[in-house]
Amino acid sequence: MEFPASVASLSANTVGSNDVLRRSVAYHPNIWGDFFLAHTSEFMEISIAEKEEHEWLKEEIKKLLVQTEYDSILKLELIDSIQRLGVSYHFEKEIDRILRYVHQTYPIYETENKDLRMLALRFRLLRQHGFHVPCDVFSEFIDAEGNLMESIAYDIQGILSLYEASNYGVLGEEILDKALDSCSSHLESLITDTNDDRLSRQVKEALKIPISKTLTRLGARKFISMYKEDDSHNEKLLKFAMLDFNMVQRLHQNELSHLTSWWKELDFANKLPFARDRLVECYFWIMGVYFEPRHEIARKILTKVIYMASVLDDTYDVYGTLDELILFTSVVRRWDISGIDELPTYMRIYLRALFDVYVEMEEEMGKIGKSYAVEYAKEEMKRLAEVYFQEAQWFFSKYKPTMQEYMKVALLSSGYMMMTINSLAVIEDPITKKEFDWVVSEPPILKSSSIITRLMDDLAGYGSEDKYSAVHLYMNEKGVSEEEAFQELRKQVKNSWKNRNKECLEPRSASVPILTTVVNFTRVVVVLYTDEDAYGNSKNKTKDMIKSILVDPV
């Protein structure tokens, strides 16, 4: 991704043996260091007893799924709890079978049950799993002015459920637009009026980031605490979720320990001090996309890829001179290690490390018969360098692009396409050449997700970067105020979410592994770029999030 320089604005600085005038940014240093390597002995191994208990509890949950009556509120709540506790990956077939039955046997528009909470929960679960169910059923809860009906004004759980459901709307579903606005306003006022601390926390979390945009592990960590406080919770499910969370966390800690060794050997903090040093943050990013144990190889490689992409961004955005970047881009374009001798030392150091990452990718993918995918991954990294170079040329020539010119380049420089294709290249799921060609063609779901990434990135970094962004260019072209520009760009983000939602509904535009990758990457963007750039400045919110899911057990 293109990571905004939020810590300090760019400034001219004379550095280097040849007294070359370069830009610089006062990034904060790495805040984790070798923590995960130094504390390896404290990260306990998973015992045989834990594995046995985990397996027994998993079978008990499967029995619960079978025994609970179909389409009852209890069945729907059970599925919702399993998903929000972060353990649905153990029960994908069972949940899919149940929801297909619910969809086929109990069409939402034919139900006689008028309970808002159940209607909204059923609607959300079906939409989450790609079923295109109509939203007309909610019209009786919204009046002509778009306000909530008086009859449900005090049904807080129902309103909260409708709020979550309305976040799965697509363009043209006005009833869901009205429901989202009305529910949001109602819930915001509730926070100050209620004395129920648990309900207040639940509402605050939902308004901050709804379920549709929540990272599984972060959401699970928070929901485990809320679920524990719920008097009606299932003790076996709670115990299973806590055990599973801690077991997976230990796996992640072990992976980070090995990645920290790789990071220490690179020693970019000393060799390339101009770049952001964010290994653990990069792992957090990738873990937000693929947290399940089976994606161990993907997490290892993709953490290295995104770390290298971050340094690549800073090379173009902060440190390289135009002459250096011309040569550098040429070498990346050719992907030829023999051509690096003409480059400055810092660029040679970087490119050797970059090429090594892709050699490792080729070796790992060769083991599972997926070597063909690596070429797609390389091509996207080359393309990322090309668009970074285009932006650097704009900077050095002081050229102000039009909004159209900017977005054409900036959608790619957001890094979304590069990371999506590199991710699909290294997961074990079989992604065919035909599917790769489809993804590379930038279909609607990728375009929408790239728009979300780029605009949220620009909105978060506005005012802290010494370069043009969508905010600057929109204000200039339309002659509007900063507030008006923000309002319009946020509207574009909102509409892009609706387009993305549509592409995830049956008939789906792509296979589940592709859609899951696309959706999860967009969720990471929401977490890191809502209101601030929490990657560039990872000392506060990001540090707390990482600590909650990678350091502290539940």
From Swiss-Prot:
Mn(2+) 1 binds at residues 313, 317. A motif (DDXXD motif) lies at residues 313-317. GO terms for biological process: diterpenoid biosynthetic process; response to water deprivation. GO terms for molecular function: magnesium ion binding; protein homodimerization activity; terpene synthase activity. Expressed in peltate glandular trichomes. Present at low levels in flowers, leaves and stems. Mn(2+) 2 binds at residues 313, 317. Keywords: Lyase, Magnesium, Manganese, Metal-binding. The keyword Ligase does not apply. This is (E)-beta-caryophyllene synthase. The gene is TPS6.
